[in-house]
Every structure is written in C-alpha cells, then in structure tokens.
C-alpha cells in the first residue's frame, strides 16, 4: 500500500514563478553591479566580465549535504559549489531556486528552470532528460532504528518504509522488479524528504530509504541513532538533467567540464569541504 503526503510550497506552476525567475536574474545583476562598484581596485574589464555572465537557473530542493541553506539563508552544499565552479568555467553564473521536487520535469520542460541539479540519479530515467555524465556516485541504502530486528533487505517483508516521492527508493519498493527487495506492507511517499527521518524516529515507519550520504549527514546533524543495512538497494550515478528539447548543448559541455574538474582535483576538493572521505563519491563502489 502506498500513501502520499504533501506540503504547501511556492506554487511553481503559476505565473509568479516566471516573475520570480526574471526577478532573480535582474537581482543578480543589480547585486553584482553594487558589489563590484564598491571595490575600487577592480578594473572595468573585470567588472564587465562578472556582470555580463548569463544566468543559469538551477532547480533543486533541500537535501543536505548536497543542497541546503546556510545560517544566512544562502544556498550551499556540494551540488551548489560544484555548479557554481563548473558553470563559471563555462562562462555562466549558477543561481539555485528551491522547487517542489515533483514538479521538476514540468519546470525544466517549460523553461522555468534551465536544469535540475540536486543529488539526482540518471538511472532508469535516461530517456526522460538530456543528462550529463555522472559527476558523483551514491549508494541508495536502507536505515532502521538501532534496536530494530531488521538486519537484511529480506527482513523488510511486511514492514513499513518511508521514502521521498518520485525517487529511486520509491520506484524500487513499488515496482517489485528487484528480487532482493521483498514486498512491504506500506510505502510512505513524502514530498518533503526531511520528513522521512521523523517518520522512522517516531515509529510511523520501520525503515527509510535514501542516499547514504544524506542519511549520514542527518544522523550527524540531529544525533539520530540509526543503523544502515550492509546491503545497498543500488549504487547510482548522479547527473545534471536538461529538457530533451534543450538544444544549447550544455549537457555535453558540462560533462567535459566535470572531466576537467576531476582531472585537476577540484571535484574532490569541493566534495572534501563537506565530507571526510570525498573519494567514496568519486568512484563506483559495490
């Protein structure tokens, strides 16, 4: 049985979102002009090189340590830093907009965002978007409370599992295509991925499934006493998604930029700002 739960956020489908997009771009230009104008040491050439960069609007949602807001309300995280550096090298400036994750495909197809970047797996979605090559790899895993009798994936039979809606874990538990994953009693599909943790902690669910990195981050931030099962659901490649009708070639150019960043060590250096073992995300692990 599947249950879906929703929360109210900015209505991204409305004309207000398009106004927001225009306002963000204009605001970015104004802020750059003001900031650069206060720096007397910069030349006119340097000022122009910054203010003239076209804006790439990146759609994402809150998912530490990949994308979240810092103490000042500014977007930060692995994906934010990677996007800013990669697009800078390509001659653009990246600007993140928090979206309803379930609306991501509609938003990018309508051009209200330029791409989707937020710990997003291409596995099984290859035909839905134009994808970059994977820039990182992540294990999708199951976590349970420390005192749980669930030790293996097989022990999930007849249990209740919390997942975020429209994610790979939701697909795996509902599709019944992987013989390793048993039928569970209930799948709680939550629009806000942060809610999967209280669902497990409060006992509404017997297990949760998500990216291992995100689970470990949440365990650290909130002192959660969870145990991650040894056997992963799967290992996925994380990519950046563009609309299939996008003809700018940004997906291919971004893939080449990722290769450059991998080769010069900047990819590992950026991930290392947030994780103690960045190399684990740079290679496929069983």
Name each region found by the language model:
Residues 80, 95-106, 187-198, 202, ...:
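Short helix-initiation/N-cap motifs at beta->coil->alpha
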Residues 69-71, 83-92, 169-191, 219-223:
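Ligand-binding cleft/hinge of the Venus flytrap
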Residues 103-106, 119-128, 172-175, 199-235:
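A ligand-binding cleft/hinge motif common to bilobed small-molecule-binding domains
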Residues 60-62, 137-144, 220-259, 277-286:
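Periplasmic-binding protein-like
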Residues 53-78:
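Short glycine-rich His-centered loop
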Residues 92, 100, 133-183, 187, ...:
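A conserved helix-loop-strand patch within extracytoplasmic ligand-binding domains
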Residues 40, 80-89, 150, 154-168, ...:
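Extended ligand-binding regions for polar small-molecule ligands
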Residues 80, 84, 93-155, 227-232:
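Acidic, polar ligand-binding/catalytic clefts
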């Amino acid at each position: 049985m599947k249950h879906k739960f929703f929360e109210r956020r900015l209505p991204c489908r409305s004309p207000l979102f398009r106004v927001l997009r225009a306002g963000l771009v204009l605001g970015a230009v104004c802020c750059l002009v003001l900031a650069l104008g206060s720096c007397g040491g910069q030349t006119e050439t340097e000022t122009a090189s910054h203010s003239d960069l076209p804006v790439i609007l990146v759609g994402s949602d809150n998912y530490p340590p990949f994308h979240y807001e810092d103490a000042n309300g500014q977007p930060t995280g692995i994906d934010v830093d990677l996007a800013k550096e990669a697009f800078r090298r390509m001659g653009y400036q990246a600007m993140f907009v928090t979206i309803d994750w379930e609306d991501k495909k509609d938003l990018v197809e309508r051009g209200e965002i330029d791409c989707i970047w937020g710990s997003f797996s291409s596995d099984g979605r290859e035909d839905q978007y134009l994808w970059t090559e994977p820039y990182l790899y992540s294990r999708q895993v199951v976590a349970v409370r420390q005192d749980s009798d669930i030790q293996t994936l097989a022990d999930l039979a007849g249990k209740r599992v919390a997942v975020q809606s429209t994610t790979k874990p939701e697909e795996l538990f509902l599709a019944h295509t992987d013989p390793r994953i048993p039928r569970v009693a209930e799948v709680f599909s939550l629009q806000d991925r942060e809610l999967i943790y209280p669902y497990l902690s409060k006992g509404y669910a017997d297990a949760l499934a998500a990216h291992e990195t995100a689970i470990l981050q949440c365990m650290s931030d909130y002192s959660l006493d969870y145990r991650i099962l040894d056997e992963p659901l799967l290992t996925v490649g994380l990519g950046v998604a563009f609309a299939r009708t996008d003809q700018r070639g940004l997906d291919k150019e971004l893939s080449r930029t990722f290769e450059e960043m991998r080769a010069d060590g900047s990819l590992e250096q950026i991930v290392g700002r947030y994780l103690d073992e960045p190399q684990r995300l740079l290679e496929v692990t069983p």
